Each structure stands twice: as structure tokens, then as C-alpha cells.
Amino acid sequence: MPANQRKNTSQSSYLQTPRNIATPLTKNAGKIVTTPKKSSTSDSSETSPTMAQTTTKSNGQLPTPPTNNGAPTVNRKKQKRRAKQAARAAAEQAQGSQMSGGPTSGDVKRQMQELEARFRETGLDEQYDDDEQFDPADENAYYSDEEGDAYSGSYGHDGSSTNGYAIPTTNSSKKQKKKKKSKSSQSDHSNHANHGPNGSSHNHVSLPLPLQSPPSMQRGPGISKEKIWNTSSQEERERIKEFWLSLGEDERKSLVKVEKDAVLKKMKEQQKHSCSCTVCGRKRTAIEEELEVLYDAYYEELEQYANHQGGDGPPPMMPPPRRFGAMSGLQPPNRLPPVFNGQQPSRGRIVEQLGDDEDEEGDEEYSEDDGDEDDFSEEEPEEIPRSHATDFFNFGNSLTVQGGILTVADDLLKNDGKKFIEMMEQLAERRMAREEDAKEQYANANYGHPSNGSMHPHSHGHVHNHPPPPEEDEYDDEEDDEDEYDSQEEDYDEEEMDSMTEEQRMEEGRRMFQIFAARMFEQRVLTAYKEKVAKERQQKLLEELEEESRADSQKKAKRAKDAQKKKEKLLEKKRAMAEEKARKDAEKAAEEASLREIEEKKAEAQRLKREENRKKKEAQKKADEEERVRKESEKQRRLQEQRERQAEQERKQREAKERERKEKEELRRQALEAKEIKEKEAKERKEKHEREKREKEAKVKADKEARELQKREELSAQQAAVQAAQSAAHVSRRANQVPTPKLSHALASPHIPVAIPAVPKAPTPIKLRTNSQQDNYSIPRTPSSKYQSISPNSVTPLPNSPGPIGPPGKTPIQHPLLQHPQATSPIHSALKGPPGIPQSPYAGMQPMPGGFQPGMPMVPPGFGRPHHDPMFGLQQGIGSQFRPLQIPNGGIPPFQPGFNIHHMPQGRGFPMHGPPGFPQHSPNGMGSIGQLFGAPKETPPSQTHSRNQSGSFDGLSSATQAQPIARPTPIGRPSSIVHGTRHSDNFNSGESDETSKHLGSSALLDDTDEPINIGVGARRSSAAPGNPGRQNFLPPPFGMDRSDPASMMSSFNTWGAPPNPFGSSSLPGSNGFGGGWNTSLNMNGSFGMTNYYHSQPRSVAVRLRICGACQNLQNSTQDGWLDIDAIKNEIALSTTVREEPLSERELLDICDTEGNPMNGGGTFEIRSSDGKSQIHFVSDSMSHDFRSAGAPGEIGSPISGGASRNLGPPGRAPIGGF
């Protein structure tokens, strides 16, 4: 069971068990006679693994009547005081012995802890009443003042257990217990009358045998260190007994004397804290005297007992002080309680049943100091002798002390004997008090004072306080409880004084002290025994260590000897082996010498044989090498011949192929020339027919227009009055009218003047030309005659009249015209303004497409936001209304950009056509004076302009043209574009042929390549973006780099937009100052350029460049094979920094592509020579595009060579010169 539960159970049993009071009789001459007072019965139901709770019953052993009649009566208080002093002295002596080699304080603490546990487990608590006091009717009321704190740790003063155990409180239960004790003590007296040397009998109640200890604790002596201090085994008890009997008389006396001296010394130390009054002095004297007597008698009893150990009968005297018959609750070992029969004795714990107050005081000490004893080890050194006479030195295994007297001895060892000294003082005080009380006849019924010396009244009438010893601070708590407990204690003292005689009280005190002295003596015996055993063990250990060291040294010596012997043997063996080896080596050397001679002879014979074989092999090898060389040279010769034959064959094939190719080209050229001749003849016939027809129509139409114009003038004269009223409106309108001033003769027209009658014509609404009209090719493309002034096939009559036409030098009469809602009609631009208003240089110009006025800034196509105003304007060219300026000998135009020609007559016109061999003006009539620097006006009908403009289609004439501009004619295709077209389906058969006038049309150069002519203007350099034109020969304008054809751009192109300020070039193949199509890829090359992208993929453009490079370099070699590096360098000249450079791998891959009319045609032959690739270009036809430099042009070609040999990619200007 758990320790706390076991402890609580034992405490409750202790409170409920009636005590057996042993009354010590007169002790004289070493005799102690005890008288049984009461038997006790205690039952316990719990056991412990190491100790058992005992159930004490009356065993029928009754003490004999007192026979020592001569023993004087001893004062109880003095006896108690002396006992306390002796206990203190014994404690001091015990401490001194411990310091000198005795058991350590730890052993003592463990001892005390185990004693307390055994005391609590014996069930002695049942011998107490409810208030822990004895019955005053049966026992002496000698109580310790410290009894009140006996159970302060576990029980309250109300008699209830803190652990739930109820304590009986009725008086009837106390009476019943006392009756039981009386009956049992009488029966015990009759059974044990022969015990004791003087006929005194003792009732021995032995401790129950404890449970079997663990196997580790039952080993024989000397097995382990624990067995030295193990007092629970039978062998150990026998050894202690033998040790005591082996001691001499002097040694035994010394042990007892040490006890007495220690107790006296301790008592003296404690007395110096008490008061020096007479009462206290008498008390100290009584204690010392009592202690002297007690220890002397105790030793005498021990000596007598030791002398009778060999006999079989009872001892000559009473057992040791712990065996006091029925009063001590003793029981022989063979009379164990029935509950615990068969158990082994406890481990030497003496717990005696005493009802005296000293017992309770001792138990109170253990209840208070229970927490301080937890650190005790299980190596308990004490072994208390047994209570039976034949087993005295078994150290009290059959002795049960239930009053706690042994705890007083432990207290002496633990706390300097404070409890024991106070107990002795109480004995002395009560003895003295009872002597006085006998005289005063119990005058004071409540006589009693606190026994702890804190405050006590005396008969001499003074009250004094005794401060507690300074070292006893730990007991301050229990003093408070003692004061409360004294009130109960005094009541019972009065009752007990009546029930016990003075002699019994004295004997009880003696018995108590003797028990204490026996406990201390046993401690000393155990200490001496332990010292002896320790010394023996130490000696034995030393001997064993010495034996071990000696054995080790012997082993080492033997090992060294053996090692030496082994070394000697090894040396012997090595010497023998060396000799044997030397002998064998000599024999082996002789054998090897003979073998070497034989081997040398064999080797020489083999060497000679090998040398002979080697010579034979070398001869054979040389013959083989000569044969191989001969065969190799033969093979090389055959290969060379084969290569020569193959080369000759290839050369013949190439020559045959070249001849065939040239024949084919010649046949093709002849066929083309014949075809062109036929076409030219047909065109001439058609043009002649058309001219005649147009001349007739023009005459009819001119007459009709003249009549209509006259009618309109008359009608306008009639409305002059109405117009006069609107003067302000007339002024603004007159400003827009273009007068016809007289022109100076210095600005005569280069055309032959022809007088044409001016036919008035009514103004009609201007009708813009739609896209369908632009594609209508049914209209006449060229005038039927160069003198023709009007077009017979006019779709809509043009409203603008060039003004009055008359003979030279005459100014026609200006009639006021009828104000027509169309303010932008060209008829108004040809009229003069009112007098005094300066004429605008753009007054005679026709309106721009989209509503822009001539001379006003207009945004070019693609610049800025579409259909919005431009960010900044570009001034319209001054002469953009007129025909291109004809520059003889290709010189610089007379009017450079920026010239101020505001003084030019407004009606002065320029010839519509240039001299023979030069391109004509733009079909929209907007060619400028700077048209020299533009591209050829070989453009298809514009998509953005309308047919609001008019111009004359008359040819050159020897006569001087009149200053007034010619009559309006329908807008037709320029003659330079009409020539050479092959779209006979859309053209009229009456187209005129201007070939003779232009030294042959350049458009005929493309007639040999029929697939390229698909579509309108596919070969026109200025017809659409992306077609290459001829590079100009003039310095580049605006600081543009000539090496980059893409930068040669204009602010306006000539397709779908008005011309740039400088006009277009009138020379063939020139781009002029911004003339022609813009070929730049960037957006900031010029003002108003459109975003331009390549119209063909890179592979097509690169192949075209390769074709051009081969054409340019084909005369640099004789056989026509060109190095690839030369071709790359030639192409690099036309590559801009913005283009990706052409790699050799890409060039070879493109040469493998099949030629067609779009990528240049022809085929490339590739070969590898000396690790480098060479390319030979074979053209499909002798097209004029790839004609060699200096070759004669086509029939009617305006220039030699027909076309530039430098071809650029689509959309780019030609590369190289013109």
C-alpha cells in the first residue's frame, strides 16, 4: 500500500489502541520489578513490504509480585529530569562517537525514519483515548507537556483524523478498554510468573516478523556492502550477538559509559538555557542523580544477562530494560499474534507499548519530524536485541514499544536531545510537585504547568519565563499546540494521580529511561559492530587489493618471461633460416650461371637466324614497293587522261550549248524585231487614222464651242447691271478671274504659233472622274495630230476655257461672265481680275484635287493623317500648271527651285510636248518647270485626279504659238505612254505612233519579255510604286546620298498626287529632284512620302540582283565563270545598311531556284574550283534588260543599250549609272 496511506492507518490505529501501562517497581541491586496494569489488544489490517503492523494482545504473561521491597521511592519528576539529562549526554556521546568513526548522520536519520515507520505501523494508536490521554482511573497521569503536538501533523485536537479515520470520543469505550486490559493482564500474570531473576514476570509482546526481504538483501555476509549493515537477517543478528559476547568487561563498560557521559554532557548543554531559580536547580540535580542511578543499574543488568547467556534456564535477572513484562507489552517470539504468525521479525525496530506521557512525547517528535527523515537510505545499521532471554542480542525483534520511547533516543541523536531532556525534567518536576502536593493535600486542583519550560509557577510564588534554546527554533510550531493540549492533559493528570501510586509512577519513569538507555546502548553496540566489520572489510579489501597487485605483478613477470623466450626462439629461427637461405642462394647461383651460358648460346644462334630472315624480308619489301609505285603511276596516268577527256567533252558540250543558246537568242531577237516592225506599222496606221478622225471632230467641235461662247458672252452682257449691284461680291470674284495680259516677246512660246479661233463655251458643272472612268481606255490616248487643239472623243465638255484666242499682239475683249455657282471652274482662272488688283501667280492654275487651290500648301499622299490637314504645308511649284520646260542639250532648267517668276504673264503657255526623244508632260497637265529632274511621265491614269484640267494636244509647229493658251481638249493618255503598249483590247485602233518623234520609244525595250507586260504599266518606271527607274545623272537634291537609291525621293510622287515643287525630269530615266516614285523605305526621306514596303519577297529581289551582277561581270572573264566573292561584292554595292547582308549560303541557295520572268529568268551553273565556288549565269533569252553594255538598242530605242544594266530590287531605283 502507499506509504502515506500506511502512515495514516497506523496513526489512526495508534490513537484507538489502549495502552499497556507498565509500572516500574523499586529498582535495587540491579533488579527491576514491574507490575502489570492492563493488557492491550490492537488489530491491524495492513502490512508493509519491509515491515508489518503488529497486533498486540495480552499473552497471559503476568509479572510476579514485587519482591524488592527495599527499593526506595523515587520522585517521578526528578527521575524524568535525570532521564532527560542522561539522554542528552548519551546524544552528545553518540555524536562524538559518530564523528570519531561511528555511523554517519545519514545513517542515523535513516534509522530514525525506519523506527518511526515501524512505530506507526504497530497499531499502538488504539491504546490511546479519544483525546490521546490515559484513563485516570487506571494509570498514572504523567504527561509530557509536548504531548499536544504529538499528532499535530496528522490529527487535529478535536480528535478527528485528517485522513478520514474517525476517533472514538465516548467515555464508555474507554471504560470497556480498561476492563479488557485488566482481565488480560491478570491472565498473563498467571502464565509468566517465573520470568525475571527476582520472580518478577514480564509480559513480552514482540514485534511481528516482517515480510521476507528481497533476494538481494538475503545474501550471505560479506557478499556486498549492504550486508555489512543488514540487521534483518538471522546471520547478521548472530554476528552482533557474537560480537557483544566477544567483548571484554572493560569494552562493555566503556560502551555504557560512553552512553552515560554523552547524555550527561548533552543535558548540561541544554541546562544552560534554563533559569537559575531554586526550583530549576533542584530539578537539574534530580535529573543528574536519576540518570546516574539508571545507567548504573542498566549496566549491572547487562552484565548479569551476559553472564547467564550460556544457561538454558531463565536469565538470573530481568531482561534488558526494554523487556518489562506486561507493562512493556512484551511477547516472546514463540507467542506471536495469530494474525502475523510465520512472518519474519522486523528489522530491529523497538517500539514499546507505554502509556506514559514520555512515550507520547516521543511519538510526537516523530510525527513532527517525519518530513525530515525522507532522505534516510535503506542501509539501516541498527539491530536491536530480541526481548526473550535466550535471544537478547537479536536486538528486540520481539520487542514492541508503542509509547514512542525509542523515538526519544532518535530525537537525542537528531535534535540534541531536547525532547529527552524535557522528558527528564518533567519526571523531576512532577516528583517534586507531588511531594509538595502531598503536603498541601491537593490544594490546587488545577496544578500543572507547561512542561516545556516556557512558563511555570512554583510553590515559592514566583513566575519566570524560560526562553527556548536558540537552536530549537524548529519546534516553535509545536509549542503552540502543546499549550492547547495541556488543558486536556491537566484534567487527566488529576485523575491518574488518584489511580496510580507514587511507587508505580517512579517505576514507570525508570522503565521508560531503561528502555531509552537500551535503545542508545543498542545503537552503540551496532556502531561498534559496524566499525569492527568495516575495519575487517577494509583489511580484507586491502589484502585483496594487495593480492591482486601481487597477482598482476606475477602475471606481468610471467608475461615478460614468456615474451623473452619467444624472442629468443624467433632469433634462433631467423638465424637458421638465414643460414638455409644462404646455402640455397649459393646453389641457385651456380645453377643460374650454367643456365645463362646455355641461354647465351641459344640466343646467338637465334640472332643469326633472325638477321638472315630480316634481309630476305627487306628484299621482298623493296620489290613490292617498286611494283606498287609502278602501278600507282599507271593509275594516275589513266586518271589524268580520263579527266582530260572528260574536260574536253564538257568543253564541247558547253560550246554546243552556247552555240545553241546564241542561235536561239538570235532567232528570238529577229522574231521580236519583225514583230515590233509589224506592230509599229500597224500603230502608225491606226494613229494616222485616229488623227484624221480627231481633226475632223475637233473642227466641228471648235465651231460649235465658238458659237456657244458667243452666246454666253451676250447673255453675260445683259446681266452686267445685276452684277454691278453686288460690287463687293464682284471684287472677290474678279480676283479669281485670270486676265490675259500681253506677253513680252522675250517669253515667246517655243511652239509655232497657230491662230485658232476661240469659241465661247457655256460653263458646265465640273464632274469628277471616277475609278471606272480612269480605267476606261476607249478614249483617245494621243491627239490625232500635233496641231489638234481639242479632243473629238470628249466624254464631258470641259468647262474651263483658256481665254480668248486671237492673233498675236491683240488682246481679246473681256466680257463679263455670268456668275456660275462653281467657283472653282477653270474658266475663271483664265480670266483677268479687276484693274488695280495684283494678279496671283496661281490665278491661271486649275484647282487641285480634293479642293486645294494652286500654290497653297497641300499634304502629299501618305503624309500625316489621311483626309486631314497636313502638319506643315509644301508650296506648290510655280510652273506646275504649265508644260515641262524644254531644256536643250540636257542643261539646267532656266527656272531653278525658288525662283520668283511672279512677273510671268498668266496666259503664257508652254508646249505640251517636249522635243523628239524626250518624255512628254504628265497627262494631268501639271508638269512643272523642274520636270527635268523628275521621272518619265509614263504613268497610268491617276487614281486621285479628275478630268478637270485640260491641255492642248497639238504637236510642234514651226509657227509661233499665240500667247493665249490653246482651247481645252479632253484629257488623254500622254503620247509617251501610248507608244509601245500592247493592250490592244482596251485601246482604239486609231492610236497614233510617236516613235519617229522620240527616236524610238523606250517602252519597246520591254516588248521582248512578254510575261512581264501583263497588266497596265507593269514595266513603267513611274507608273506604280516598286518598279525600278533610271538613276539620275544630276547631283542629288537636298544633300541626299546618291549611293543609296532609297534616299532619292521626292516630297510628292507623280502618281495620284500633284507634282513636287521642282517638277519631274524631262530626261529619260532620270529621277530628278524628287521626280518619279519614292524609293525610300523610311518615312522621313521627304515630306509627304507614303509608307513603302517591298512589293516582292527577298528571294526574288536577291535573284534579280544576282542576275544583274552576273550580267555586269560576264565580260570580266573569258569563259563566263564568276567567283562567288566577286558576285557578292557587286551585290554589296547595291545593298544599303538597312538590308541584311547576303551570305554565301543564301546566294548559293537562291542560285538553285528555277528562273521565271518575275525573278530574272535564266539558270545558274555552280562549280567548285580550288575550294571556291564559281557561278555561270545562262540567260533564257537575250532580253534588252540583260543586254551587254554597249550593245545596240532596240529599233526606236531612245538610248543606247535600251536599259540600265544595273538592276535593283523591285521598288528600288536602279543601281549604278544611267
Swiss-Prot record:
Compositional bias (Low complexity): 34-50, 86-95, 206-216, 716-730
Amino acid composition bias (Pro residues), ranges on this chain: 313-322, 799-810
Chief localisation class: cytoplasm
Keywords: Coiled coil, Cytoplasm, Stress response
Bias kind Basic and acidic residues: ranges: 107-123, 224-237, 431-440, 544-715
Biased composition regions of type Acidic residues, renumbered to the chain: 124-149, 354-382, 470-501
Keyword Coiled coil assigned: yes
CDD domains, alphabetized: ATP-synt_Fo_b
Biased composition (Polar residues): 1-26, 51-72, 159-171, 769-796, 940-963
Cellular compartments per GO CC: cytoplasm
Region of interest called Disordered, as start-end residue ranges on this chain: 1-237, 306-391, 431-508, 544-745, 765-810, 911-1010, 1018-1037, 1190-1218
Domain of life: Eukaryota
Coiled-coil regions, chain positions: 421-714
Bias-annotated ranges (Basic residues): 75-85, 174-183
Subcellular location, record wording: Cytoplasm
One Pfam family named in its UniProt record: NST1
Protein family: Belongs to the NST1 family.
Biological role: May act as a negative regulator of salt tolerance.
PANTHER family, alphabetized: LD36051P, STRESS RESPONSE PROTEIN NST1-RELATED
Protein name according to UniProt: Stress response protein nst1
